Swiss-Prot record:
Official protein name in the record: Cytidylate kinase
UniProt key word ATP-binding: yes
Catalytic activity: CMP + ATP = CDP + ADP; dCMP + ATP = dCDP + ADP
UniProt organism field: Clostridium perfringens (strain SM101 / Type A)
Family, as annotated: Belongs to the cytidylate kinase family. Type 1 subfamily.
EC numbers: 2.7.4.25
Length: 217
């Protein structure tokens, strides 16, 4: 039986993690698990059910009733493909509040680890290399300037026909950087053994080539 491979990709919002992880996953035949989308799914359901980030017990009951899995890189929640719903600006603004709750993270991290025990996986998020997959075979930390990340997110949403304001996105990214880096539970930080790649000014395929070269050594 072939040994399972685990790849961790971490970095701030808009650093290109999911796009790059998806391509690497296809190239090396790894299951791509977008962990951020799992927290976004929790945020979506919480907002739909009017459950605030302070109502932890209600949140945990809600999560226990959520059936999440991935099909062709897309998140399926209770039988419904919710990828288009969880990228809406309202979810982006609220996700940090729910993702910073210790009990919520414990529930989802447990689910992520179970996936990694069954399949060769590539996961992207904020704490994959430091918490979720501490013993990952490969760890990468992607960065980019806030302006570059805001520009990417702006173009991505406009292409989807969602009217957005660049400055609002930039301020949202700066705020999320602060919240993600300073939260008490599993803050955004680079694992000591992770390879850092600044994606500012580098095309997606340039980053893919860099990561591939490390994995093919």
């Amino acid at each position: 039986m072939n040994k399972l491979i685990t790849v961790a990709i971490d970095g701030p919002a808009g650093a290109g993690k999911s796009t790059i992880a998806k391509i690497i996953g296809e190239k090396f035949n790894l299951m791509y698990i977008n962990t951020g989308s799992m927290y976004r799914a929790v945020t979506l359901k919480a907002l739909e059910n009017n459950i605030s980030a302070e109502e932890v017990d209600k949140l945990l009951v809600m999560i226990d009733g959520m059936d999440m899995h991935f099909e062709n890189d897309e998140l399926i929640l209770n039988g419904e493909n919710i990828n288009s719903l969880i990228t809406m600006p309202n979810i982006s603004k609220n996700v940090s509040a729910y993702a910073s709750i210790r009990e919520v993270r414990e529930r989802l991290v447990n689910l992520m680890r179970k996936m990694a025990l069954k399949y060769s996986v590539i996961m992207d998020g904020r704490d994959i290399g430091t918490v979720v997959l501490k013993d990952a075979n490969f760890k990468f930390f992607l960065t980019a300037s806030p302006e570059e990340r805001a520009d990417r997110r702006y173009k991505e949403l406009m292409e989807k026909g969602i009217e957005v304001n660049y400055n609002e996105i930039l301020q949202d990214i700066i705020k999320r950087d602060y919240l993600d880096s300073n939260r008490e539970v599993d803050p955004l930080r680079k694992a000591e053994d992770a390879i850092e790649i600044d994606t500012t000014g580098i095309g997606i395929m340039g980053v893919v080539e860099k990561i591939s070269s490390y994995m093919e050594k």
